[in-house]
Amino acid sequence: MTNKKFQAINVVFYSQWDSYEKWKNILLKQNINLYQWPDDFIKNKYYPNINTALVWDPPEEMWKFFPKLKIIQSLGAGVDHILNKSYPKDAHIIKLSDPNLSNQMADYILMSVLMCHRKIFQYSINKKNKDWNQIIPFDKDNFGITILGYGTIARIVIKKLKYMGFNVKVWSKTKRNPKNIQYYYGSRQLHKSIKNSSCLISLLPNTSETNNIIGLSEFNLLRKECYFINVGRGMTVNEQELIYALSNAILSGAILDVFSKEPLNKKSKLWGLNNVFITPHIAGITNATDFTASLLKKNFHALISNKKIQNKIINTRGY
């Protein structure tokens, strides 16, 4: 590969949720050419000049038309929408790590924790019953929080929760070296990290090792009054066991932003549970930003210069 051959950054864009026009205008400022799939392409024609993709949940049949693809940039923090299908194995997959997105998700988690801590679910029920009844919130010292996953977002959340006076534990699949935090890692320490917490927060990605990692066995380890918050991936939770736990007072409530199948089926029992707060995968909403456009350009030039690429995922791990 020579630098001259790949100086132009030509990007194929696909997303049913993100604005092509906004991304096109942002990328043009970085001299990056953006083309929308399938609108800007002739059917069944190959495009070797396209070297980069910017996508969310792309159809796998599109990849064959771009034989020289080198970078696939996800439009979200997760990459399972790429890895769970056939994709160009020679391409480097990049997760979106935009400070704006990370802070959005951190804010959502803080909101959720406070809703649980102040028992807002019960007030919602009281409102329907026109019941004027004051409820004593949890003592923060007795409202332990366990976070599953220790990435960028988790680190932001931990810092803010500790500043607010909450006791926080964290678990990750692989060993890290966090400071000033009760830390657990590996499958053998998962249950130890959850035991006696009042609030379980999942930031886990969807991989073969995290699929259905959370279920009744984990919920039963929590305190009597306890809550579950999921902003990671829906496939990490056994949804039927979650419904059972919520229906049988094993969990006092749940705040759910992600589900095993999205949109959430209208027949799902989760919709009818008073102790569940549902949002449609909006904890972090991707915006077209100069930060991401600049990072896309930097990563492309890093690739052709044989330098380190930022936010590259390890395909075998899934994150």
Task: Give residue ranges: language-model regions.
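C-terminal helix-to-coil terminal segments
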Residues: 2, 96-108, 122-123, 177, ...
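Rossmann-like adenosine-cofactor binding region
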Residues: 175-269
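NAD(P)-binding Rossmann-fold cofactor-contacting core
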Residues: 163-180
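Glycine-rich, N-terminal phosphate-binding loop of Rossmann-like dinucleotide-binding domains
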Residues: 57, 76, 203-204, 231-232, ...
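Short acidic low-complexity segments
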Residues: 36-46, 60-63, 181-196
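Glycine-rich NAD(P)-binding loop of Rossmann-like domains
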Residues: 123-156, 183
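Phosphate/diphosphate ligand-binding glycine-rich loop within oxidoreductases
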Residues: 48-124
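N-terminal glycine-/charge-rich "phosphate-binding" loop or analogous flexible N-terminal tail
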Residues: 1-50
